[in-house]
């Protein structure tokens, strides 16, 4: 099966190495963007070429990438940087289609979400976004064998749709059931395409589970008994699941160990475990600033509350965009409550809280 390969990053040419001594890449990027919006020294960028309504409350954006984007595999995620009110805000998205230098992301508007609201309501053709390197391990295996099961809830359909499209291009070489939970039929993304795929491939079956449909009974949440009745030979399946954290945890608890393989990704972070109250001193070694931060908030949230904007992406400990060095002090993992105090160790701001006075390389 043909897989979407990640391209090898371009190395600096001799001309670039000489030119770097004469001009800063940031200065080059500023002037180059006046000539062509996707020109840059080495920064991966993408320009919005098309936008389509994907479902109620969701849009699909077609992006053209520049030559510095190294590519990705179906099922992976990318960080998308959006300029809002003079500041760049980064969020993670799973492309729903990958084709050469074109990628598609399908974004559902989130209440209070500045980036999703901008992308769904205000982003215009020609707008340029910063791109991060691809990350994520839930991709199509090189060897295709046995029946598969895709489990999607809400926006969790997007990475699985990218994988479905790649399987379609390869002639659907596997028997596959997709079970897709959405609140209402109007919120089902890719409804027509999914129906067409199922009609084209005898081995593909699509099951929609609507949990809040007004004109019919509500489908049950994920349940192993329901799945066993819906999907033949459940125990022989390779399972790929994506959805909110609670959905993924429920799927894992019910299926892991009972199926041939279980792979999953969540698009929301787990609920942070409660920490100790009070506040501590946080010193930023590069700027020399010392802040007072709460012990029960992630370091990323605490810094943002002080008006700072450290680099971030997924906000749930996966992409490592927010990683920095802890010089001194003890941090607490907000997902496990485990503590760590090794000096000069890397911490992820989005899932770490200060347990004691702390010094970070920021």
Language model segments and positions:
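Local cysteine-cluster metal-coordination motifs and their immediate loop/turn environment
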Residues: 159, 304, 308-333, 342-356
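Short, charged low-complexity linear segments at domain edges
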Residues: 281-306, 323-332
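Iron-sulfur (Fe-S) cluster-binding modules
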Residues: 1-40, 355, 360-361
